[in-house]
Amino acid sequence: MSGSYQHLSNVGSRVMKRLGNRPKNFLPHSEKFIKKSTPEFMKSDLKEVDEKTSFKSEKEWKFIPGDRVVVMSGASKGNIAVIKSFDKRTNSFILDENGPTKTVPVPKQFWLEGQTSHMITIPVSILGKDLRLVADIDDEKTPGKTRTVAVRDVSFNGSYYDADYKKVMPYRCVKGQPDLIIPWPKPDPIDVQTNLATDPVIAREQTFWVDSVVRNPIPKKAIPSIRNPHSKYKRGTLTAKDIAKLVAPEMPLTEVRKSHLAEKKELAEREVPKLTEEDMEAIGARVFEFLEKQKRE
């Protein structure tokens, strides 16, 4: 289901999400209808996955665009190809021209620039279980040289901050050999040669240094041009309406609560009786009598 109308409103987003949550008994009929109405060049031979089972992290994908892999099944078995992109609908990968492909007819309204034939060759999605990661490792027989090998499986141990991807990435190792780390491929450089973009090197270049923690680096006369002096958040005073929003309203008291508060107030106002000399002598006599009785026993 296309989500091209989700930007119109939150209501549209909810409708599109509801259409994706189809009843289980309706799924076979829905998938059959979608498959029949989808053009041949847009169909996938793999089964689509739902949002819960869709891969989201590098640990789940194991391979990312830029990795070299060897195809282990199909007509392209044994070919070394480069991963171009993910197919998140089916948890699969799209490879370059060395990967599996198929020739399909394309209606003229979908032709690309420079296309001259109705038949074109397009890549076919392939699952990760049919791929093996290709890596260059040091050759033990020839010191100083490397050899290309296909890794049966990979594991992840620890993490680090990758400056190329600008996020924390897990260490990818050969399964069973945690000391043999296979680095992630570097992402393709972003082309910013346009009038509306700034080169990242220029954007990150520091051209201003703060030389005082007391003096404001912005001139006082320049502040109104940066901040709106008429903003209601910069007034420094609170109106009655603002105070009403900040002060919580008093909750009404029940009759039981009112009687409890009145009784508590009455007890607080009652005078506490003071002990006289006679009372203190009587208490001392009773304590002395009790202690003498304890000694006799």
Swiss-Prot record:
Gene3D superfamilies: 2.30.30.30. GO terms for molecular function: structural constituent of ribosome. Its main location: mitochondrion. GO terms for cellular component: mitochondrial inner membrane; mitochondrial large ribosomal subunit; mitochondrion. It is found in: Mitochondrion. InterPro entries: KOW, Rib_uL2_dom2, Ribosomal_uL24, Ribosomal_uL24_CS, Translation_prot_SH3-like_sf. Residues 63-96 form the KOW domain. Keywords: Acetylation, Mitochondrion, Ribonucleoprotein, Ribosomal protein. The modification N-acetylserine is found at S2. One of its GO terms (biological process) is mitochondrial translation. Pfam families: Ribosomal_uL24m-like. Component of the mitochondrial ribosome (mitoribosome), a dedicated translation machinery responsible for the synthesis of mitochondrial genome-encoded proteins, including at least some of the essential transmembrane subunits of the mitochondrial respiratory chain. The mitoribosomes are attached to the mitochondrial inner membrane and translation products are cotranslationally integrated into the membrane. Component of the mitochondrial large ribosomal subunit (mt-LSU). Mature yeast 74S mitochondrial ribosomes consist of a small (37S) and a large (54S) subunit. The 37S small subunit contains a 15S ribosomal RNA (15S mt-rRNA) and 34 different proteins. The 54S large subunit contains a 21S rRNA (21S mt-rRNA) and 46 different proteins. uL24m forms the wall of the exit tunnel. PANTHER family: MITOCHONDRIAL RIBOSOMAL PROTEIN L24 (PTHR12903). This is Large ribosomal subunit protein uL24m. It comes from Saccharomyces cerevisiae (strain ATCC 204508 / S288c) (Baker's yeast).
